[in-house]
A protein has these predicted regions:
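Alpha-helical substrate-recognition element adjacent to the catalytic core
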Residues: 1-13, 17
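Asp-based, Mg2+/Mn2+-dependent phosphohydrolase catalytic module
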Residues: 150, 155-167
Length: 167
């Protein structure tokens, strides 16, 4: 059951795709239960193998989507620096349009503005009427930082990235 849904405008999704392709990065989004992307690559194979999802290839992403997606993911399997450079180069454009973070070193995700694990956790706390003092969050990656910061008790996994250990 979906408790709350936020989505990226299709124009923003298309722009992320255009910018990713210009920079030579693989990028994908989702239509219901399918991955939607422009080309078949090793990154797509990697993701399909782990997610067991089906995929659709299309020339123009906005032509394939009949509703706004919840996220867009750029994937690079060999050089996470390339994704970091992309994120930095597009930060000014993305400001106020979407939120970006790494869910692992290979995945740079773009989601609706003000949408992250922290806002999701806060939504649940309010919906379920849980006292803030009863909240605990555990994480290991960059995308977990807002959740850990929003909880009363935040725990970083031993194998977590350095930034989460500082949060």
């Amino acid at each position: 059951r979906v408790l709350h849904k936020s989505s990226l405008p299709i124009e923003v999704t298309q722009e992320i795709f255009d910018r990713a392709h210009k920079s030579g990065n693989y990028v994908q989004t989702y239509k219901t239960v399918d991955i939607v992307t422009k080309r078949h690559t090793k990154e797509l194979d990697y993701y399909v193998e782990r997610s067991h999802m089906t995929y659709k290839l299309t020339r123009r992403i906005s032509d394939c989507l009949d509703s706004e997606p919840q996220k867009v993911i750029l994937i690079h399997l060999e050089d996470d620096g390339k994704l970091k450079r992309f994120q930095k180069a597009n930060a000014a454009w993305a400001k106020g349009k979407c939120n970006s973070f790494f869910s692992c070193k290979e995945y740079l995700e773009y989601c609706p503005v003000d949408t992250d694990k922290g806002t999701g956790a806060q939504y649940l706390v309010k919906l379920l009427n849980i006292p803030h003092t009863s909240t605990v969050a555990i994480g290991d990656e960059q995308n977990d930082i807002p959740m850990i910061q929003s909880a009363h008790i935040g725990i970083a996994m031993k194998n977590g990235i350095d930034d989460i250990k500082k949060a």
